[in-house]
């Protein structure tokens, strides 16, 4: 694990998080449900994604044999690192978010509802 090459570290955490079932179940999926259900703006969604990054990263470091608390992770990752990770993970799950949002709000997102085969009630 190389803390000197920030982008490699960010890429490793992102790749690992997209394949980790516990991270998905505990942080990623609930964030998708919350932001899709409440139909948050893009910037509010990014704030929500940024909030889960320290927990996801702490799990990553622990699984890599370097147990860390969320507070310790916050000392390692810069605000820019957290933003990069949040944007990357959101991109990885954007289609799932759009489908979930269409299920909650089919009348507001009829194109997405149609794309995912969701009835709009029309």
What is each stretch, according to the model?
Residues 1-122:
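Acidic interaction surfaces
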């Amino acid at each position: 694990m190389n803390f000197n090459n920030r982008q490699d570290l960010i890429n490793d955490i992102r790749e690992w998080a997209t394949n980790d079932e516990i991270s998905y179940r505990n942080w990623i999926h609930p964030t998708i449900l919350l932001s899709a259900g409440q139909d948050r703006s893009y910037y509010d969604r990014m704030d929500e994604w940024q909030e889960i990054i320290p927990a996801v990263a702490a799990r990553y470091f622990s699984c890599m044999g370097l147990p860390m608390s969320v507070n310790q992770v916050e000392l390692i990752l810069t605000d820019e690192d957290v933003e990069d990770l949040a944007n990357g993970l959101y991109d990885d799950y954007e289609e799932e978010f759009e489908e979930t949002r269409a299920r909650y709000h089919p009348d507001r997102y009829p194109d997405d509802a149609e794309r995912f085969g969701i009835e709009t009630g029309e």
